[in-house]
């Protein structure tokens, strides 16, 4: 019972970590490429949406 759960959580957290790094990279790219427009997309609501999407992709 513990082994499949361990495997699932290992893959889940590894994928989530990689996806978070990708999201941070995209965010930094946009901040460099379009600095004026980047501030419009950085709010609590958009951060929550981005984090939720990353976790949903990781679970799926």
UniProtKB/Swiss-Prot annotation:
Protein name: 5-hydroxytryptamine receptor 2B
Motif (DRY motif): 27-29
Compartment(s) of residence: Cell membrane; Synapse, Synaptosome
InterPro entries membership: GPCR_Rhodpsn, GPCR_Rhodpsn_7TM
Name of the encoding gene: HTR2B
Membrane topology classification: Multi-pass membrane protein
Record remark on domains: Ligands are bound in a hydrophobic pocket formed by the transmembrane helices.
Example GO molecular function: G protein-coupled receptor activity
Cytoplasmic side: 27-46
Extracellular membrane side: 1-4
Organism expressing this protein natively: Sus scrofa (Pig)
Keyword Secreted part of the UniProt annotation: no
Annotated signal sequence range: none
Keyword set includes Transmembrane helix: yes
Role summary: G-protein coupled receptor for 5-hydroxytryptamine (serotonin). Also functions as a receptor for various ergot alkaloid derivatives and psychoactive substances. Ligand binding causes a conformation change that triggers signaling via guanine nucleotide-binding proteins (G proteins) and modulates the activity of downstream effectors.
Transmembrane segments: 5-26, 47-60
